Amino acid sequence: KSRSRGLGDVYKRQERYWGTPLPVWRSESGEMKCIGSIKELQDEVAKAVAAGFANPECPDDVDLHRPVVDGFTLLSDSGEPMTREPFVMDCWFDSGCAPFAQWHHPFDEEQRFNASFPVDYICEGVDQTRGWFYTLLAVSATVFDDMAYKRCLSLGLILDAEGKKMSKSRGNIVDPWDHFNREGADATRWYMVTAGAPWNPMKFDPNGVRETYAKMFLTMWNVYKFHADYAALDGFDPEAQSVPVKDRSALDRWVLSRLHTVASQYHDNFTNWQFHKACRDLEDFIVNDVSNWYVRRSRRRLWDEADSHDKLSCQHTLHEVLETVCKLVAPVSPFMVDHIHRNLTGTSVHTADWPLGVPGGLEGATADDWDDVAAKATAVLPPQDLVLERTMALVRELAEAGRRIRIDAGRRQRLPCAQGWIVAGPDLSEFHDLLAEELNVEAIEVETDLDRFQRLELAPNFRALAPKARADVNKVAGAIREAADPEALLASIRDGGADVLGVLVEATDVEVKRVEREGFAAQTVETEGDEQQHQVSLVLDMNDTPSLLSKGMARDIVRRVQAKRKDLDLAIEATIDLEIWMEHAPEMMAGDREWVATETRAAACVFHESGAQPAADSERFEVDGT
């Protein structure tokens, strides 16, 4: 309302040659006529000719622009000649008439006009608030007593990375073609959508485009290449008999459920014009759910050279996820996903069905629906399992807790632990093997009592203790800290007080802590259940054995060799010859040596003990200073 009060008159005329001529003729005495159609102009020209005024012909296809219309002389009601006003309409007035002028309404196309007016959506820069947005509304309200559009998106201005207006004089202009040629139009478009709400001013940061390219599009391409490479090796045919969703692994069912959840939210956010939120959520799904979790946890399933139910399940799941992701990304970044979709299905993603259609709709498909049409350009989403999603979220939280435990304890990630325990929380037995591999522990067990891994520790509360102990406060504090049996001391304190070096120590004089016993480390996470939050603790056994040290060394060697294979751009199925010289390193057990050879696809694998001279072209690395 305040904006409309501040608006001045719209300039309806301009002293220009090009444009829509004002259809107004004026006599010298001030009489005016406004002509509303070609038929009306023809009639007025005929009257003027009959009155003796010379006029050119006025056919049905007469050119209504200058200089043609300026050649017509009309007749006033008092018999005077009338000439056209020498002005053209303001171009914004033309734009305001676009909804009906495009159909030549009211003379033609009434049905098409009625079907398209008011329009569903218009979009322009914020500077059009006083321009096109206003003239559309003003003309529509005046002529039709109605709005011209149902929804209007006013885009914020694009500024430089520091929030300053771009200008040649400042030298802060960004040439979009620099980014199109370097990172590609896909990454540029995705960055501009995800950088912020579209109605806010945007600080365009070239580094953001590069980060988007690396994080989003390289990740998506790598996921596709991972699937395509193994699919080619195995001769995978997506049209062949699939594995029913209900018979797939929990990991497969989880990522399909997440796909359902993310796709539904993506659709809803687009419908509500929250484009930035939609694309951020989808990017998080691609990077964290698909690449960093599903693909990473599924690599070994595809390494098996023999055909298996589990491998086929993984291949179909990856294919279905990629196909649907391509459809979701396409409206914003259309190029790379079209290439991927053509390779997956043989058809363009831009002719595929939107994945939230019928049957199934936003509620998704039943498991049977999904199995029947998943290999075809389906219009349904896979079945959703929110309980499974919450459970997997807890599993991932515990995996992250395990990484934090190792960092805090200074224990490298590839050195396995003998055992891990999950204390409290829901049943995760279905994921114990997955979690054990992710945490790099030999076994996962369930424990109900966290006290098994903790001990009591008493600390003095100096603020309460000092007035009692006075000069002996430090001695009393030391005695409390170094108590031989802190649990017995705490029991005495809580039972009326305990005498410590002649000072009565009460409950307010101490602070009670529980810390991990020697050889254990723990972290506690909170997770939401159906109606309440759960506290779940993860405990790791931090003690080392020769067997664990051997396995840890084997894992570090494999990582180095795999990185070298990648540097050499070796094919997945390529075999190598491997020699390893070990100096001041833990003894490698026979089983771990065989594992190294298998994991690295080494046809020959030789281990040299300390004292052997490494080859001149060998690569040296240290593990924990060794």
Language-model regions, residue ranges each:
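Feature 926 captures the class I aminoacyl-tRNA synthetase adenylation module centered on the KMSKS loop
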Residues: 9-93, 97, 143-185, 209-626
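Aromatic-residue-lined binding/catalytic grooves and analogous aromatic/hydrophobic interfacial grooves
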Residues: 106
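Structured mid-domain segments that build the active-site/substrate or prosthetic-cofactor binding neighborhood
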Residues: 194
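A short glycine/serine-rich beta->alpha loop
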Residues: 116-127
